């Protein structure tokens, strides 16, 4: 079976705003978004014209903190669509405003043809993560509205200790929706220690994988795992994918990101693992659970990445 996946190497992300109608406990921007400002339309036009002229990317992602809280979003979408160079224009969104079907229709009419929607659990679990009561209901209403349109929909769930105990159930439900692929992201702690107690151990994650894989296989959909150690791969329909699209964000964010110690690996640091794309473990993970050298394994030319048979680049 061929599993449909997008190729993120062909996407570039532009962040338009840093406002949000959720207050997620897991937000990577929570410590910096109040200090960052969005981009005006003239500057955005220059950015997307440079992207077009580079010829490097064929798809555009519009993001924010929550891009649908940006009142002028439709004008930015229209500007991007008018260039005629982007096959896909995606928004990354919590999906709550998409419950307004006319608002959704207007965005699609302006040029949005792909939606990346975050759903972090069922009911109260999702609402506890977003810290907005009723947000799960609104997001699912938005997801339901998308069924009426010829657009690509991808779901995203960030795995934390808050939702891992019931992670299988939302994945089961999402696998039955009009969604082309299901993403699960490993939680990125924007700190060197897990002070919030969100980081899930790879052993616990490994226990979840067979059930998650079963739901995806039954639905004929790809289950894409982002920023997990690639040596844990179990084969299709599960795809361990370390690739993230090029992302345009203020330097302040990248400075803080670089201080958090991502990409740690016992075997890579010893020179035994040759995989340079894998996200490995974070400093916060190492502090909490250790280096997992008995669980992980080096990927070398003689011991190739299990991803080679998975079509890692997508398509």
What spans do the regions from the language model cover?
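Glycine-enriched alpha-helix->loop->beta-strand junction motifs that scaffold or abut catalytic
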Residues: 109-114, 177-181
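Conserved radical SAM core fold
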Residues: 21, 67-69, 95-98, 115-132, ...
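Radical SAM enzyme [4Fe-4S]-AdoMet core and its adjacent flexible, acidic
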Residues: 44, 132-144, 148-265
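Hydrophobic faces of well-ordered beta-strands that scaffold small-molecule active sites
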Residues: 10-14, 60-62, 89-91, 115-117, ...
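Flexible mid-to-C-terminal extensions adjoining Fe-S/redox cofactors in radical SAM and related proteins
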Residues: 2, 237-238, 242-304, 315
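Glycine-biased, low-complexity coil/linker segments
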Residues: 308-313
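Conserved alpha-helical substructure of the radical SAM core
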Residues: 1-92, 98-113
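Flexible, acidic/Gly-rich N-terminal and inter-domain linker regions that tether
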Residues: 1-13, 22-26, 208-231, 288, ...
């Amino acid at each position: 079976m061929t599993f449909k996946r997008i190729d993120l190497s062909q996407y570039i992300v532009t962040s338009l705003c840093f406002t949000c109608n959720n207050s997620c406990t897991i937000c990577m921007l929570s410590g910096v978004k109040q200090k960052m400002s969005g981009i005006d339309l003239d500057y955005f036009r220059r950015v997307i014209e440079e992207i077009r002229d580079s010829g490097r990317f064929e798809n555009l992602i519009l993001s924010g903190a929550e891009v649908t809280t940006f009142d002028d979003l439709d004008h930015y979408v229209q500007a991007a669509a008018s260039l005629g160079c982007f096959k896909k224009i995606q928004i990354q969104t919590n999906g709550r405003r998409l419950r307004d079907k006319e608002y959704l229709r207007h965005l699609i009419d302006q040029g949005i043809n792909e939606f990346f929607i975050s759903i972090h659990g069922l009911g109260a679990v999702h609402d506890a993560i977003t810290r907005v009561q009723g947000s799960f209901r609104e997001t699912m209403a938005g997801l339901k509205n998308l069924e009426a349109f010829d657009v690509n929909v991808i779901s995203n769930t960030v795995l934390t200790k808050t939702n891992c105990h019931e992670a299988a159930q939302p994945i089961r439900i999402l696998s039955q929706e009009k969604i082309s692929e299901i993403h699960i992201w490993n939680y990125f702690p924007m700190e060197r220690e897990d002070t919030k107690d969100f980081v899930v151990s790879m052993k616990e994650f490994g226990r979840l994988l067979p059930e998650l894989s079963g739901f995806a296989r039954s639905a004929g959909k790809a289950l894409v795992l982002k920023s997990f150690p690639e040596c844990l791969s179990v084969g299709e329909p599960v795809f361990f994918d370390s690739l993230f699209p090029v992302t345009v964000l203020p330097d302040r964010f990248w400075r803080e990101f670089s201080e958090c110690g991502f990409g740690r690996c016992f075997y890579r640091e010893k020179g035994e693992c040759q995989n340079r794309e894998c996200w490995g473990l974070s400093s916060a993970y190492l502090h909490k659970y250790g280096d997992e050298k008995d669980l992980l394994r080096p990927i070398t030319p003689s011991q190739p990445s299990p991803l080679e048979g998975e079509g890692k680049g997508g398509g």
